[in-house]
């Protein structure tokens, strides 16, 4: 079991080193992909330093950050509340270009409105099924807004 953890730490270090070039600002090609991709795949960091399985999620790229609406009971939200805000975000596919970010649960009503507007266009084929859940969820606390700021 110790060997597996060691291997995971080595993999994590390799990912960290591969993202070093984007530590201060996202590469222009990555920004372009964020502006055109339908999905991001978010892995949150576990207590032991390993990464969760990437989860596909709808997102908004706005003012240099990635925003998602999620259940406050989701692992990504729980880990942020528990002081582990670090995430790895892959763009477009699980093995797409990726960067590290810090998540924060935020109260930004204007950004929520922007997110809902963008989702209505970006995910038009499925929006009718989910719109009420998103709108009511942000109002009654069944959804929280997470802002991921690139490291």
Each PLM stretch: what is its role?
Residues 73-151:
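Short, structured beta-strand-loop surface elements
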Residues 10-20:
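Bacterial N-terminal signal peptides
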Residues 23-27:
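Boundary at the C-terminal end of the N-terminal hydrophobic targeting segment
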Residues 37-72, 87-90, 98-100:
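Short beta-strand segments
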Residues 28-30, 45-46, 131-136:
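Short, P/G- and charge-enriched loop/turn segments at secondary-structure junctions
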Residues 19-22, 36-39, 46-47, 65-69, ...:
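A short linear-motif detector with a strong N-terminal bias
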Residues 31-35:
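N-terminal helix-cap/turn-to-beta initiation motif at the start of protein domains
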Residues 2-12:
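Bacterial N-terminal signal peptides that target proteins for export
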